[in-house]
Every structure is written in structure tokens, then in C-alpha cells.
Amino acid sequence: MKIRIKIKLILASTLLSSSVLASGELHLDHANTNISDTASLQNGAKLFMNYCSGCHAISFMRYNRIAQDLNLSDSLVAQHLMFAGEKPGETITTAMPEEGAAKWFGGTPPDLSLVARAKGTDWVYTYLRGFYKDDSKVFGVNNK
């Protein structure tokens, strides 16, 4: 049941983003990405695990695959990216309980495994750059 809902959400977001992009209503900043820049990718993994993984899962990724893709040893990944005794072959889930997510956010924050593939790196870059300080919000930030 949960898998069907996730698939529907991914498909809906893909269709929605495609229709918005086709209509020309959304300007996307260009993400100057370089998938060969291993140091930058390692930094991105560190930032995600430190700032995003508390709420967002990337359940189609495994810790040992991140180690392999980023030329890191399993011990380095365990030391710097695994915080709750996970095993290298496990998928990356969030520690946030669903009932807490519903209470705090009105729903479970989306799994980010396929966002860049579904919406594109320019969309992700634009979205992340859209955050600003907003003291009226619970977490002190908001997004355009």
C-alpha cells in the first residue's frame, strides 16, 4: 500500500513539474553540476546526512553504494554518515516517526531518492536556493 502511494506521488510530481516547465511559468537557476567532482559529491552526502536525513529518507540508496560511488571506505561512511547503528547494506531511512511527521509537518516529508532524476538538478538547485530566514515559521526558515 505504501509503495503504491509513493509511486503515485513520484508520478504526480513528475507530471506536475513537467507541465509547469512546459508552460514556462517557473524559472530555474542553472546548477553547474559536475558528477566527476568527487570532493563536492562527498560534501553533498555529508550535508544531506547532517541536515536533511532527520526528516527525509533516500530509501533507494544504500550506505555501501554511497561508499562505492564516492570512493569512501565503509568505515569512513560508518563514522561520518551513519548515526544510529545502521549496517552498510541498509537503505537510508529517516529516524522521524510517521506520527511525528504528521503532527509536525502535516504529513511525512518526501523521500528524496528520485527527486533529481524526476525533476532535474536545476529544479533541486533552485528549490534549495529558495530558502530564506523567516522567524514566523517553527524552524525559522521558509521557501519561496
Where are these regions (language model features)?
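Glycine-rich loops and low-complexity Gly/Arg-rich segments
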Residues: S53-G54, Q79, S136-G140
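Post-cleavage N-terminal segment of exported redox proteins
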Residues: M1-I35
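Generic alpha-helical secondary structure signal
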Residues: A39, S75, K119-D122
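Structured domain cores in non-transmembrane regions
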Residues: I66-K103, G107-P109, V115
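Residue-level signal for alpha-helical context at structural boundaries
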Residues: R62, L70-S73, G130, N142
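Extracytoplasmic/lumenal ectodomains and periplasmic regions of secretory and membrane proteins
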Residues: T121-K144
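Electrostatic cytochrome c docking/interface patches
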Residues: S23-K46, A57-Q68, V77
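C-type cytochrome heme c attachment motif
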Residues: K46-I58, T94-E98, T108-K119, W123-R129
